[in-house]
């Protein structure tokens, strides 16, 4: 069974040489998202008593951009030994090939009711709201991410999550 280290190594290899929106190595974004999602999942489990494994959430968070931003596939994740729930969560978080509006993708993610995916997307959206990752003239991105974060937070709350 793959570990967090294995997920990190898989993501590091898959994203080798890639830079994020802020010009940093992609892995920094993935690590920030994974740490935030793991913290949220820990709250969900320990405080809210929800059936969620923070370590599995962290694995999925480290892998959340692999299918979207690299040639890797869900079959590659399965071949590497990642379990079905992790592959499903990563797949839910992956932008579809067809052009679908961001708000519709958030609606689809919310409708899936996958708490792990919601907490990871909250963490991803929160990281994307960081001023160093959004150009100063891109107020529309700040608005898009802020609106999505509130929708995701409300959906997580509907699942019983009481964290921020």
What are the language-model segments listed below?
Residues 1-164:
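Active-site helical microenvironments for divalent-metal-assisted chemistry
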């Amino acid at each position: 069974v793959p570990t967090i280290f294995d997920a990190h190594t898989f993501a590091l290899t898959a994203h080798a040489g890639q830079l994020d929106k802020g010009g940093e190595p992609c892995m920094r974004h993935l690590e920030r998202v994974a740490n935030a999602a793991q913290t949220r999942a820990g709250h969900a489990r320990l405080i809210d008593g929800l059936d969620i494994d923070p370590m599995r959430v962290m694995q999925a968070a480290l892998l959340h951009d692999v299918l979207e931003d690299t040639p890797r596939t869900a079959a590659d994740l399965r071949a590497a030994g990642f379990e079905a729930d992790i592959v499903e969560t990563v797949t839910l978080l992956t932008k579809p090939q067809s052009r679908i509006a961001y708000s519709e993708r958030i609606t689809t993610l919310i409708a899936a009711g996958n708490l792990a995916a919601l907490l990871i997307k909250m963490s991803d959206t929160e990281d994307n709201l960081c001023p160093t990752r959004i150009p100063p003239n891109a107020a529309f991105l700040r608005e898009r991410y802020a609106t999505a974060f509130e929708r995701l937070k409300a959906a997580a709350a509907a699942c019983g999550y009481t964290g921020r």
